[in-house]
Amino acid sequence: MDFIDFDSFQQDEIPQPQPALSLPITSNIENLGKRFSNFNSLTKNLLKFDEKDDIKVDGDESEETKLAEKYANLSLNLINSLEDDNEEENESDLNRSKTTTTLSTRLSRVLNNSMPDSLVREIFANLDLKIENIAALVEPGITGSNSRKKLRGEIENDLIKTQGLMLKEYQPVIKNLSNLENDLKNLNGLRDSITEKVNKDFQSTKDLNGEVKNLNDTKSLINLKKGLLISFQNKFALDVYEEYVLQNGEINDEFFQVLIKCEKIHENCSILLSVDNPQLGLKIMSKFNQLINKSVERIINFTNKTLNNLYSLNTTTKLTTLHQCLKFLRKRLNYFNTVIDNFVDTRSRLIIDEFLNQINGDLDKSGDNRSGSIQHDRPIILSAHDPVRFIGDLLAYIHSVVVNETETISSIFGISKEENEDDDIEYKDIIDDVTGRILNSLSRSVKSKIEQVITSETKLATIYAIYSLVELYTIMFAKHLKESSNDKHNLLMTVRELVSSSQNKIISIIQNKLTTIKSSNSAQLELNTDLQPPEWIIEFYSDILPIIDQNTSDTFMNLSTENNAEFMKMIINKPIEIFNEHIENNISKLFNRRDQVILKLNFLDLILSKIMPIILLSDKILELNDLTEKLSLELTNLQLDSLISGCQLTNFYNIINMICPFSDDFFDVSIYQPITENKLFSEDNIIAANDIIQNFLPSALLDIQQSLFKVNSPMIVNNIITNSSLEFIKFYLKFNLIINEYLDDASLIWSDIEVATLLGVEEPYQQTKKSMSFD
């Protein structure tokens, strides 16, 4: 606890008022134990300091003498300070202000600690009990100083008592610590004895460890040398058995394992070449080079022997070994290509010999039980009566060869499912390449045989049947073969060329027929007075249309769009052109225009009747319908002219058309007023025309039917009669209106309805008249 020294001997002046201070008495009391502990520490330090000083001073001086001297000096200093204080009492107000400030600082340090009000109240209550006379405490003289010192002593006495009670609480702990002191001393003694023994044993152990370390180093060195020797033997040497396996052992999994090891040793020898003396590496490399080369030769011989005798692959073990050989050789393309070339040559010669023997009928030679040969019960015989069967049998045989070779090569070069996908793709390419090279050897022979048949055949039906067979087998071959543009003798390309040859042959035959017909005199002489189509067109379509009808593709024989259009033009338009040329050149017959039109109509009608059921010719049907319409219109105009001339109205018809041609959409009588200026337009001529009309029209229908009797199509005849009669009646009606307008006493004898009845078109005319316009 902090105490206040307020020794002042001034009586007249009172200190200046100061702000209220909080006195943290309780907190100082609580911290008193800590202060005592600090005091104890200070005392220990002083004692240690004194002990050090005792070493320096002489041994005759005692500690009590030094302490007495020190406290005497402190007392003298205190007296001197008191004298100085008495002198300072007479100083100015500034010094009193400093004293007051010092007092305030002390009070603030003591009272500013935060404490509960109840604790402050209790502290001051206890302090009040100690204070007997407050006036004596605040006196500035000696009496006040003694009173304050007395109060201080009482407070300190209470604090000492309080601290003593607190120290009593630690007495059991101190007692226990005293008991532990003896045990600790015993333990320290045991520790010292054990430490001494350990130190003695440490030296002996140290010597033993040194000896063990030397032995371990020696052992490690020996193990290292042993490991190096074993590693060298494993990496750079083969045992006797492994050398025997490579040189004389059976080719199997063990053989390839040893061979792989041998190759690794050969590769690792490059390390030995980098040492100072490379002779050892060179010797090892030379030895293993010989072993590897001999092993490769054994693998090549085994592979060639196995591939030449495919019947030896009847076991899974043999096939697996062959796959391992091929996989090993695949890494050495020069050896692999040599093996494949030998195999391809052998198989190619075999299938060519078998093919020729089948064609030539020599079954004894083809049945010599060679590996992978295809046996047939009968030869393929070319028959002049049935070339389609010959080509069918030939293509069937080729297809069986293709399937057999594909399956054989796939079984030989196919890999197991355990292989990865990259190897699968790689071997698939090899299978396709080998199969194609073997089968391509047949391309020349097959092409020559089939082209020989195609070239010698002249029947369209036969050529088309051959085309269908070749086209069918092209699709079948495409499933097993790949087309290669680099190989000119690719079998699939050869078959496609045969398809083109058959297409060209069909087109060539048709062109030759048309050329022959065009230049044939007999074809021109077939034009006669019955106006019927010539026989050559019937024969022409009897050969061509059946094969077109058999076609199922979008274009004929899968021709391109342009070629298909040219072909259709050749079989439809070209005959029409030839027929028209025949009509124009046939002057001896002296066909009039009507007969020529009827001939053309009958010709087109025949073509339409032939091609109508064929869907592939639907575009040409529309084109022929347009031509028929044009010819029908021309014949209708001729028939109209015949009716007008029969009624002797041709001059009037020409005059009216010169003024303004008739139209169904518009008619005005006033437009034709200039006709009155013509001398022919008179009452006498109209009366004469009536007489002729009266005699001609009753039998005109029979005359028309008789003139169209040679037209083959009843529909065309009916349309021509109806249209020509309607046109005549329209002219008759309009001409009668003109007469009525400009000739007062003249008129045609019959009305338009009566004329329509005479011509047999009353009902159609009634419907047509409704759409006519008269102004």
Swiss-Prot record:
SMART domains: COG6. It is found in: Golgi apparatus membrane. One of its GO terms (biological process) is protein transport. Signal peptide: none annotated. It holds the Pfam family COG6_N. Keywords: Golgi apparatus, Membrane, Protein transport, Transport. It is a peripheral membrane protein. It comes from the Eukaryota. The keyword Protein transport applies. One of its GO terms (cellular component) is Golgi transport complex. Its main location: Golgi. Belongs to the COG6 family. Acts as a component of the peripheral membrane COG complex that is involved in intra-Golgi protein trafficking. COG is located at the cis-Golgi, and regulates tethering of retrograde intra-Golgi vesicles and possibly a number of other membrane trafficking events. This is Conserved oligomeric Golgi complex subunit 6. It comes from Debaryomyces hansenii (strain ATCC 36239 / CBS 767 / BCRC 21394 / JCM 1990 / NBRC 0083 / IGC 2968) (Yeast).
